[in-house]
UniProtKB/Swiss-Prot annotation:
Function of the protein: Specifically methylates the guanosine in position 1516 of 16S rRNA.
Organism lineage: Bacteria, Pseudomonadati, Pseudomonadota, Gammaproteobacteria, Pseudomonadales
Organism: Pseudomonas savastanoi pv. phaseolicola (strain 1448A / Race 6) (Pseudomonas syringae pv. phaseolicola (strain 1448A / Race 6))
EC number: 2.1.1.242
Protein family (similarity comment): Belongs to the methyltransferase superfamily. RsmJ family.
The name this protein goes by in its record: Ribosomal RNA small subunit methyltransferase J
Superkingdom of origin: Bacteria
GO cellular component: cytoplasm
This protein's encoding gene: rsmJ
Keywords: Cytoplasm, Methyltransferase, rRNA processing, S-adenosyl-L-methionine, Transferase
Compartment list: Cytoplasm
Amino acid sequence: MIEQQTGSRIRVEALAVAGQEQAEHWAQRLGLPLHDAEADFALQSTDDGLQLQQLGDDAPGAVRVDFVEGAVAHRRLFGGGTGQMIAKAVGIQPGVRPSVLDATAGLGKDAFVLASLGCELSLIERQPIIAALLEDGLARGRDDRDVGSIVARMHLLTGNSIEIIRGWTAEPPQVIYLDPMFPHREKNALVKKEMRLFRPLVGDDMDAPALLEAALALATHRVVVKRPRKAPCIDGPKPGYALDGKSSRYDIYPKKALKPKAVTDDSGA
């Protein structure tokens, strides 16, 4: 059963007749009730997929993972390709598409960008509700003609990122990407609805220093930490350098240079 924070009671419900079976599946899997009149959130099964809706007055709109349409799809088509700062941060360059572990996957937006540029991605999300949204979005994306091949490069793991990284037995990723949620100081009322919706569920990643330490021990080439542009670095080792954007900053912890894979000559010459 999910350990729910104070003020974050969640129920599961179907908004379409055909979604009742799926709602029952998620309720059983997540240990959540199908009926709770006092719930603060509803995980809803709809014709368009799984979504999370905050309940009550002034609640932001529902959030779901959609790699086919909307903002994520627009970014894939018009977002700048390999010229994007995130691409530079993880080391994408001609002949280099590093394997990346996104240890704070969230809704998978950054991971999808990297997968669309040719990287193989492992994703870890520890909050079960967010992981459910991401799993549902990945399943729908795999069935889409346009993005199916991209989503096929994204492999989801659910659990505590630090524990998974420390117990990693597969080939180590070349790059580990972190975007931890830190104590909220933003005064702007136009904070993204995902942030407004998830903060009561997720809280702050107070174990970010331990996550950085684990990531530095596993990544073979670099660790990348995404931060608000004016925010302090994570406590611990200082980054080697940073890439600054208008609102975000990427702190780079280099370990080894990323180089193009050598092309072998099989011609027999």
